[in-house]
C-alpha cells in the first residue's frame, strides 16, 4: 500500500519524488512532494533551489520582480519582545552608574548633534544603495571572520529577493540587523545566534536574512523596520496577502529564550500560512479548471470551425461539380448544334442525284451501323468525298465513320489524307453500277 504522500502520483512523479529525496536528503516525503509541486515537477529547478536554500542563495529559476514588495510594519498586533539591560546591583554598581550617567548623556548628545550637522555638509553615504548583494556578501564574510562559520544559513540576496522568496514559498523570514557599534552585538552573535539549537531551528523553519546597518542595504532596511535597539530581529511572513512584520525581538536575548520566542511567533501565526497555502491551492485549482475549460472551449471551437470549413468545402465542391456539369452540358449542346449545322451545310452542298437512266450513274446501297439501309445514286465522275458528305448529312449516321467495300474488302478513301490528298472518283475506286457499302462507326475510337 502506497504511503499517503505518494497517493495520486504517476509512476514518473513517484520516481522523481524518490530521486529528489535521495539527492537532497530530506526525510519528509510530503516536504519533497511540495518542493517538486512548487516547481511543476521540474527536478533540476527543485534540486537547484534546495541547494540555493541551504547556501542562502536566492532562486535562479524564479527571479524577483523589479519592484520590491512592501512590508506592513504598521500592524498594531505585532508581537514585540524587548530585553532591557540589567539594572545596577549594589552600592558600587549604582555609584558607577550615577558617575557615568552625565558622561554618557553628554557623549550621545554631542554625537547626535554632530551626526545631525554632518547631514547638511555631507549626505549619509548609506542612503545610496549601489551594490546590495555586495553589502550582504561583505557582511557575511566579516561575520564569519569574527564569529566563525557555524551560523544560520545567510540568504545571499537582497532584502527584496528574500521577501519575494518567502512570499513565493510561504515561509517565515527572519531579518537580523547587526549594530557594529552596539555593546551587545558581539555577545548575541557568539552566544545566541551561533548556538547549535538556534542554527537548527532557523535553518529548518525559516529563511534568514542579515546585514549590518553600516552597509547601505542594511541601513535601507533599518529605515523601513525602525528598530529601537540592538540586537534586532524581525519575523516577516505573508499575512492577509501582504508581507507583514509579525514579531520583533530587541535586546540581548539568550539562546533558550530566543528559541522560545521564535517558536511562539511561528506557532501563533502558522494558521495564516496554512490559510494562505489553502487559498493558493484553491486559486491554482481554479486556474487549472479555468484553463481546462478554456482548452475544452478552444477544442470545441476548433472542431466547429473545422466542421464549418469542411461544410464550406463540400458546398464549394458541389457548386464546382454542378458548374462543371452545366458547362459540359452547354458544350455538348453547342457541339450537337454545330454538328447539325455542319450536316445541313453538307446536305445543301450535295450535287443532284443522277437519274436511273443515266449510264454513268452508280446505285449504292449503304448499310448503316443500326442495320438500316439507305439508297442513292451517284455519278462515276464524282469524288468519293460526295459519298462521305451524303452519309454525314444523314440523321442516322454516326459522327465519325468510315466506308468499307466488301468485294474485295477494303476501306474507301472518302476524306483527304496523307496517302490520298485528293480522294479518287467512284470510277477510280473501282465501283460498279450497283454497289453495297458498309458504314463502320468510329465515334468511340
Swiss-Prot record:
GO terms for cellular component: endoplasmic reticulum; lipid droplet; VCP-NPL4-UFD1 AAA ATPase complex. Residues 275-350 form a coiled coil. The keyword Zinc does not apply. Keywords: Acetylation, Coiled coil, Cytoplasm, Endoplasmic reticulum, Lipid droplet, Unfolded protein response. Residues 303-348 have a biased composition (Basic and acidic residues). It is found in: Cytoplasm; Lipid droplet; Endoplasmic reticulum. Residues 300-361 are annotated as: Disordered. Residues 357-439 form the UBX domain. SUPFAM superfamilies: Thioredoxin-like, UBA-like, Ubiquitin-like. The modification N6-acetyllysine is found at residue 167. It comes from the Eukaryota. PANTHER family: FAS-ASSOCIATED FACTOR 2, FAS-ASSOCIATED PROTEIN. This is FAS-associated factor 2. It comes from Mus musculus.
